[in-house]
């Protein structure tokens, strides 16, 4: 999701199709390419409000990745932002999101390994 209206429409349509097709599990949203966290929260709240009103579900905000010129430079150099510019704003934001996901991945891996 970005703060662009078309992105909001696309995210909502994706969530609606997922629900229609019987998708289960939580819906976690990452807001990307925003100038500041507040802008990302505003974009997320618009999506959340639409989902709650029309789909009767509430997605969760997994994280916000701020707009950062270092991302474009990383792409040009064909390297991840985490490798090329680990202290860039976007890299720090991605690390926060990864930290939130890591316990879930470990839990899913453990359950899978146990044959659950």
What residue spans do the PLM features occupy?
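Conserved Switch II/interswitch segment of TRAFAC-class P-loop GTPases
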Residues: 1-13, 36-40
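Alpha-helical scaffold segments in soluble metabolic enzymes
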Residues: 13, 17, 70, 93-100
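Signal for well-folded cores of large energy- and translation-related assemblies
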Residues: 16-19, 35, 52, 66, ...
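Arginine/glycine-rich "motif VI" loop of SF2 helicases in the C-terminal RecA-like domain
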Residues: 17-25, 50-58
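Structural beta-sheet core signal
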Residues: 28-31
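Beta-strand-loop-alpha "switch" segments that mediate conformational coupling across diverse proteins
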Residues: 54-80, 94
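NTP-binding/hydrolysis catalytic cores, primarily Walker-type P-loop NTPases
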Residues: 76-116
């Amino acid at each position: 999701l970005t703060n662009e209206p078309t992105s909001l429409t696309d995210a909502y349509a994706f969530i609606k199709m997922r629900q229609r097709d019987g998708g289960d599990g939580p819906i976690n949203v990452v807001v990307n390419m925003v100038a500041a966290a507040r802008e990302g929260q505003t974009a997320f709240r618009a999506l959340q409000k639409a989902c709650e009103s029309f789909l009767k579900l509430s997605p969760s905000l997994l994280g916000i990745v701020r707009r950062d010129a270092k991302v474009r430079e990383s792409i040009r150099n064909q390297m991840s932002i985490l490798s090329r510019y680990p202290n860039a704003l976007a890299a720090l934001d991605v690390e926060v999101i990864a930290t939130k996901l890591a316990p879930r991945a470990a839990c899913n891996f453990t359950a899978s390994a146990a044959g659950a």
